[in-house]
UniProtKB/Swiss-Prot annotation:
The lineage of its organism: Bacteria, Pseudomonadati, Pseudomonadota, Gammaproteobacteria, Enterobacterales. This is UPF0434 protein ESA_02427. GO terms for cellular component: cytosol. It comes from Cronobacter sakazakii (strain ATCC BAA-894). PANTHER family: PROTEIN PREY, MITOCHONDRIAL, ZGC:162634. Pfam families: Trm112p. Belongs to the UPF0434 family.
Length: 60
C-alpha cells in the first residue's frame, strides 16, 4: 500500500483516518471499527464490503 495514498483516502463512513494492516491486507477505520479489504492492491472502500472488527482487534 502506497503511503501517499493513505494520506489522502478516508473512511467512506465517517471520513476518518484509515490505517493499513499489512498482515491482513486491509484498511482499518478505528472509529467505526471496520476493515476494508484490498483486492489486487486496490482498496475496496464500500461499507457493504467492510467487515466489523472483533473486540480483540480493537483492543490489542
Amino acid at each position: 500500500m502506497d503511503h501517499r495514498l493513505l494520506e489522502i483516502i478516508a473512511c467512506p463512513v465517517c471520513n476518518g483516518k484509515l490505517y493499513f494492516n499489512q498482515e491482513k491486507q486491509e484498511l482499518i477505520c478505528k472509529a467505526d471499527r471496520l476493515a476494508f479489504p484490498l483486492r489486487d492492491g486496490i482498496p475496496v472502500l464500500l461499507e457493504n464490503e467492510a467487515r466489523a472488527l472483533t473486540a480483540e482487534e480493537t483492543n490489542p
